[in-house]
Amino acid sequence: MNRVSRRMMRAWAGMGSRFLPFADAATPDLPLPRLLRLSLFQVSVGMALVLLIGTLNRVMIVELGVPASLVGTMISLPLIFAPFRALIGFRSDTHRSELGWRRVPFMYRGAMVQFGGLAIMPFALLVLSGVDHAAGAPMWIGLLGAAAAFLLVGAGLHTTQTVGLALATDLAAEESQPKVVGLMYVMLLFGMIASALAFGALLAPFTPGRLIQVIQAAAVATIVLNGVALWKQEPRNAGSATLRAAQGAPGFRQAWNSFTQGGQVVRRLLSVGLGTM
């Protein structure tokens, strides 16, 4: 950092937290560096979203020559798991763990599933397009492989994001929870912007080998980001206390019925669903 940058940082820090974005979301128990580290799971989600919706959308159609209708179908596959986010969040709320963790096991599984999808994705796409050495491979292998890859990435990112936001609200004080969630989504946007710039730079000029390198690097980055984000975040409760709390919790159907008894629930869900589409 040069001398001018140091002076700018000192001046900005001297203005107080009122001029620092989301500085008021931090508390003595949850300082801003810890919050920013936790938000790295959103960076991994943003990276996956940009890769699926933006980068591969263009690469599959232009460079690999895959029909646009098939590309649209593949990109829509991760949305299949979106309605299950309520169930995923409920299961993490009531998870029985002798280790005393509720959120960590689900985020670990989500990160591993997302990693698996990204790991097989470039090879499946090359077989699907029939380029280079994959020219003689049966197309159905590429179809099944690409569909499985997109489904795995979708399941992983939905699980990671749902449980990660639940963990953030667990750690934050009640009055600062809206600000913490806002910070998480700002980091999601940051991850999307940074990933878009990185993918664009790394894939120019395009080659099949470079596509494999970039997507598998994204798979490794997913594990690293989520590992750093989770490190010593969720406190461990006594196993017996966690089991007792889980045993006394209502079932998902009962919790869903209680939720739907509120006013205009169906209208709100339809609005969110249509807005997402």
Task: Show where each model-derived region lies.
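Membrane-embedded alpha-helical bundles of multi-pass transporters/translocases
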Residues: 2-243, 251-277
